[in-house]
Amino acid sequence: MIEKMVKESEKGILIDIEVTTNAKKNEIGKINEWRKRIEIRIKEQPIEGKANKAIIKFLKGIFKSEILINSGTTSSQKTVLIPDKTKDDVVTILKKEIKSI
């Protein structure tokens, strides 16, 4: 299932995420099978780009890689880009981090 949310592109690896702000802590949640997205919980509020910055910082720490928001900068549904990892690397890391796996 997770492989459907991680896609290869010319620029790198794309991950479809669903963001919840104002969380108790920053964490990767579970797979939202209905929306086909990985849930990310962030402590920051979505004000003046604070949540987006927190998402980037949080995911950089997990993937040890550059992270860019590819689409959805003003939405809770986003696609992030990891330009310097393989799909297998990303899937392996996510499987270790996701709560429901």
From Swiss-Prot:
Family: Belongs to the UPF0235 family.
One GO term describing the cellular component: cytoplasm
UniProt superkingdom: Archaea
Protein name: UPF0235 protein MMP1055
SUPFAM superfamilies according to UniProt: YggU-like
Signal sequence extent: none
